[in-house]
């Protein structure tokens, strides 16, 4: 299952995604989490998790507070979580997760990018079944110590990998909050953490022109304001 974060990191690294995009994305997530529950992260676990992730991305305290205050103020602004599935160059598989206040705009923007890459959007489930949906944590800690802590706290993991002092934990998405709490309670900090889609099989695109089309497609998707995350099954040569 390896290198869960590498595919996503490689994709994001090829974009010129400004901090403003990260701020905007987390601003929406914080606002929606605060609006869906209480605006207090101590009593709203979903809000607490989003804030923790936002801080790791250097989202400022002002942006966090501003979006919580907006939710407190009873703003009628609303966002829907939408997922699209599609096929890129050479049959590559792509999942796009969006948070949008205008689904017509979002689907139009996403479809245009797929059309430019000579790809196509699929129906719901056409791509999803070829990915595992997992909570993933990368933790810099001794393997035996970390596994012992997880076992003692009845954390149910589905798999793990250890390489050069970093342990990658895989679990069902429902275990995300529990794992985060256990790590924090034991003074362990994750280098990376996310609920993500991991391809069951990866592929390489051999043709340079097709690879360029794929890169432009992923870059374009990541640059859309409504797009929260992009997952795919392509690895570059040499990875």
Curated annotation (Swiss-Prot):
Any one Gene Ontology cellular component term annotated for this protein: cytosol
Gene Ontology process terms (BP): regulation of DNA-templated transcription
Protein's recorded name: Probable transcriptional regulatory protein ACL_0044
HAMAP family: Transcrip_reg_TACO1
Family: Belongs to the TACO1 family.
Alphabetically ordered keywords of this record: Cytoplasm, DNA-binding, Transcription, Transcription regulation
Residue ranges crossing the lipid bilayer per the database entry: none
Subcellular compartments: Cytoplasm
GO molecular function: DNA binding
Species: Acholeplasma laidlawii (strain PG-8A)
PANTHER family the UniProt entry points to: TRANSLATIONAL ACTIVATOR OF CYTOCHROME C OXIDASE 1 (PTHR12532:SF0)
């Amino acid at each position: 299952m390896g290198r869960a974060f590498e595919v996503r990191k490689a994709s994001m690294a090829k974009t010129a995604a400004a901090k403003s995009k990260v701020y905007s994305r987390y601003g929406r997530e914080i606002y929606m989490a605060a609006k869906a529950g209480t605006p207090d992260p101590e009593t709203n676990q979903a809000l607490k998790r989003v804030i923790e992730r936002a801080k790791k991305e250097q989202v400022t305290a002002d942006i966090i507070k501003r979006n919580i205050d907006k939710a407190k103020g009873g703003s009628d602004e609303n966002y829907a979580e939408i997922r699209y599935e599609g096929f890129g160059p050479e049959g590559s598989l792509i999942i796009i997760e969006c948070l949008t206040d205008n689904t017509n705009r979002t689907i139009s923007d996403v479809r245009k990018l797929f059309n430019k890459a000579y790809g196509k959007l699929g129906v719901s489930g056409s791509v999803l079944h070829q990915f595992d949906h997992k909570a993933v944590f990368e933790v810099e800690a001794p393997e035996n110590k970390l596994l012992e802590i997880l076992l003692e706290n009845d954390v149910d993991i589905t798999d793990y990998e250890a390489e050069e002092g970093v342990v990658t934990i895989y679990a069902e998405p429902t275990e995300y909050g529990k794992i985060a709490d256990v790590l924090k309670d034991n003074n362990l900090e994750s280098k990376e953490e996310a609920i993500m889609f991991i391809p069951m099989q990866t592929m390489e695109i051999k043709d340079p022109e097709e690879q360029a089309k794929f890169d432009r497609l992923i870059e374009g998707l990541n640059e859309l304001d409504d797009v929260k995350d992009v997952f795919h099954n392509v690895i570059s040569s040499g990875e």
